[in-house]
Amino acid sequence: MVSRGCSITVLFRFLIVLLVIQVHFENTKAARHAPVVSWSPPEPPKDDFVWYHKINRFKNIEQDAFRPTHQGPSQGIGHKNPPGAP
């Protein structure tokens, strides 16, 4: 049989643990805020042809921008002294 002192000690320890857990969860509960959810309607799906046309248009601009101006190796690549170096 369990002595009365032992049962009181076990009960006291259980209450202390319960109190610590309650204090811990109460603090975390008070620190949390409800997340703000803003709902907006989804965008309509894009037309594949328009999307493809836009990509090609930008690629053509990039290709025109980097065309070499004259024949031969690129200036500054493969030379010990690139053009414009003192």
Curated annotation (Swiss-Prot):
GO molecular function: hormone activity
Keywords for the protein's UniProt record, in alphabetical order: Apoplast, Developmental protein, Hormone, Hydroxylation, Secreted, Signal
Location of region: Disordered: 63-86
Induction: Slightly induced in roots by nitrogen and ammonium chloride NH(4)Cl starvation. Accumulates in response to osmotic stress (e.g. mannitol and salt NaCl).
GO cellular component: apoplast
Tissue expression profile of the protein: Expressed at low levels in flowers. Present in lateral roots, shoot apical meristem (SAM), flowers and siliques.
PTM: The mature small signaling peptide is generated by proteolytic processing of the longer precursor.
Residues recorded as bearing Hydroxyproline in the entry: 68, 73
Signal peptide per UniProt: 1-30
Propeptide boundaries: 31-64, 80-86
Coiled-coil residue spans: none
Biological process according to GO: cellular response to nitrogen starvation; nitrate import; regulation of leaf morphogenesis; regulation of root development; regulation of shoot system development; response to ammonium ion; response to osmotic stress; response to salt stress
Protein task: Extracellular signaling peptide that represses primary root growth rate. Promotes shoot growth and modulates leaf morphology. Regulates systemic nitrogen (N)-demand signaling. Mediates up-regulation of genes involved in N uptake and assimilation pathways.
Family recorded in the similarity comment: Belongs to the C-terminally encoded plant signaling peptide (CEP) family.
Assembly with partners or alone: Interacts with CEP receptors (e.g. CEPR1 and CEPR2).
Protein name: Precursor of CEP4
Organism: Arabidopsis thaliana (Mouse-ear cress)
Lineage: Eukaryota, Viridiplantae, Streptophyta, Embryophyta, Tracheophyta
